[in-house]
Amino acid sequence: MAIYRNRISPIKPTDAVDYKDIDLLRKFITEQGKILPKRSTGLTSKQQKKLTKAIKQARILSLLPFLNKD
């Protein structure tokens, strides 16, 4: 029998995910600039989709890099 536990989402459902909030977006990307998967961030599917769109929009507007060259 599988045991499921409720996870607390790191982003509150009332909080808006915005492409201009770079500090929040940086928490959900790796050092190489890749978007972290839902299973490691603990977000809901809806929040993950909004986060992904916000990160991609921030990349296009040059607020976030596509790749980190370190």
UniProtKB/Swiss-Prot annotation:
It holds the Pfam family Ribosomal_S18. One of its GO terms (molecular function) is small ribosomal subunit rRNA binding. Keywords: Chloroplast, Plastid, Ribonucleoprotein, Ribosomal protein, RNA-binding, rRNA-binding. It comes from the Eukaryota. One of its GO terms (cellular component) is chloroplast. SUPFAM superfamilies: Ribosomal protein S18 (SSF46911). Coiled coil: none annotated. It is found in: Plastid, Chloroplast. InterPro entries: Ribosomal_bS18, Ribosomal_bS18_CS, Ribosomal_bS18_sf. GO terms for biological process: translation. Part of the 30S ribosomal subunit. HAMAP family: Ribosomal_bS18. Belongs to the bacterial ribosomal protein bS18 family. This is Small ribosomal subunit protein bS18c. The gene is rps18.
